[in-house]
Amino acid sequence: MNEIDQKFEALAAEIRGLREKEIYYRIRKHFDQVPREIQKSCMDFFNQFNYWGRLDPEKGVYEEIEEKGQALFAHMEDFVWLYHHLGDYRSKKTLYAILNNWYRYDFTTTAQAKEYLFDDYFDLDLVSCSTEEVVVDLGAFTGDTVLSYLKNYGQDCYKRIYCYEITPKIFALLRKNLEQYRDIEFRMKGVADTEGTMFLVSNQTSASANTLGQERGEEVPVTTLDQDITEPVTLIKADIEGFEQKALEGAKHHILNDH
């Protein structure tokens, strides 16, 4: 058993032995031990983007800690299962680093797990390609990920690319930036687990963090990958502000049958 295996098993054993409220208070204790400047950076990030809820101890707001504590308590067995089914050391270290950060606010291990050799998403040792690749980019933004794909793998290394983006102004930039490339489908739709209509929720910090919600506003059609793409899919990249799991559930047929 290597070092990361040992650390992961120890973390899992500790969390398994705690009640949900005990996990919550231990996370709070670990946060209190973090240097003040890092605390402020964390609070600014959580409160701006609201991925895990807000964090403002001076006002008694600990939503971020509550939600992560609930996730660790409810899903530790799922995380253990996932860890033992990962096929490479880097992925296991990354999972351990994430969970350890949730529990202990340990940023050292997350920094060690960050991959610097390759561009984001495209580890050439893990992700290969062929001329038959059908790539789906969920949250395509201005086309930066597609351009990175083309740089890393070449313009002949795909059959078709599907780009999904929900913000009209960003969608226009996406089309402009990628219009010179062949066989790219542009779809101004949200992607989830069911078809329907939702509403654009703008993020004041960055348009890249715009998301979907139920409150009235600018309507956005929502689809599923199983309904919207009929050909086999080989690669899905998803950065859609908390809708990733729903998008994967809506791609269940592709995931089960295309690989």
Q: Which role does the model predict for each range below?
A:
Residues 1-259:
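Phosphate/nucleotide-binding beta-alpha loop and adjacent structural elements of enzyme active sites
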